[in-house]
């Protein structure tokens, strides 16, 4: 991996659900968001980070949201929708896309922490706007589309002990 220019202004967008379910399904573990944020920034000028999270009716995730805030990550919260028949949904794809486009004006590098292939067109758009786009995700669950679209893909599975809280 190449050394990152320290003058680059960096924004980090974290698709919490994508990383959470990948870590749980692959390792039965929780994500170390502090380590991921440090990896993303890599000594460059940190401008902002957003974590896109889902709130349930019980509110049990509030301490987790507070922990993210203490790391300097702004939480974007969406309530979990429950539909007739028991289906549940809390899709952040459009929200992440809108934020990426809206907030990247004074940014050199957008770091997307998600393996969701639906973001490949967003990655292409940002690159066409002159932004460098780096993707951080779990290689086995990340879409080949997003891996190919990114200027750089970092596979969290290279160092699971660093990026996960293993049991």
For the regions a language model picked out, list residue spans one by one:
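Domain-level signal for Mg2+-assisted phosphodiester chemistry and nucleotide/NA-binding surfaces
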Residues: 1-92, 132
């Amino acid at each position: 991996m190449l050394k990152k220019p320290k003058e680059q202004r960096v924004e980090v967008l974290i698709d919490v659900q994508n990383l959470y379910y990948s870590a749980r399904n692959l390792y039965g573990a929780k994500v170390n968001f502090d380590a991921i944020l440090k990896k993303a920034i890599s000594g460059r000028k940190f401008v902002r980070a957003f974590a896109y999270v889902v709130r349930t009716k019980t509110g049990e995730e509030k301490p987790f949201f507070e922990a993210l805030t203490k790391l300097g990550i702004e939480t974007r919260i969406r309530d979990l929708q429950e539909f007739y028949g028991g289906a549940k949904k809390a899709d952040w794809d459009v929200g992440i896309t809108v934020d990426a486009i809206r907030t990247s004006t004074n940014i050199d590098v957008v770091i997307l922490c998600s393996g969701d292939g639906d973001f490949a067109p967003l990655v292409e758009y940002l690159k066409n706007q002159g932004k460098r786009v780096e993707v951080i995700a779990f290689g086995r669950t990340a879409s080949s589309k997003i891996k190919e679209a990114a200027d750089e893909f970092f596979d969290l599975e290279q160092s699971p002990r660093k990026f996960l809280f293993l049991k």
